[in-house]
Amino acid sequence: MILCLYVDDILIFGTSLNVIKEVKGLLSNNFEMKDLGEADVILNVKLIREGNGGVTLSQSHYVEKVLSCFGFSDHQPAPTPYDPSVLLRKNQRIVRDQLRYSQIISSLMYLASATRPGISFAVSKLSRFVSNLGDHHWRALERVLRYLKGNMSYGIHYTRYPRVLEGYCDANWISDADELYATSGYAFLLGGGVVS
């Protein structure tokens, strides 16, 4: 049994419908509660149930909304979210459209933390330049949006197995000689999908 709480919303997950009903009964006896049935979307994340007991978390509708909002619906897709040959440095010229850049970064951070961990590195790298950006930062940011355009349907798929927590990590302690920034990353998987 898993209970997920967010402010005044509760998701109840379990393998037995009887146990879920019992938990709902206990909660409704102690709190004012409204049962909305099976959840389809929560916090802009679609829950897609598979016939084999798996579930996929997707934000394709949110990606579409972000691309439309920032005028990237008609752009050509990019194969990867980040080009490692591009060296991002502090801007030495006039800052270009800082507010819009930070709005896009915020939208991408939400995607990266919810269902699109594959863009985390690029978004993290680009967020370092929110207060000091130039044209090369914009081109790199546009690449992330173009990558999402080509992969809107991507999400995180969870299966019943394996029931083992797997963890992976890596680090590059001095990857940027100009700024002396260290870069590290990690991923923990459960049921075949990323949980952290």
Predicted regions and their residues:
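Long, low-complexity, charge-biased intrinsically disordered regions
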Residues: M1-S196
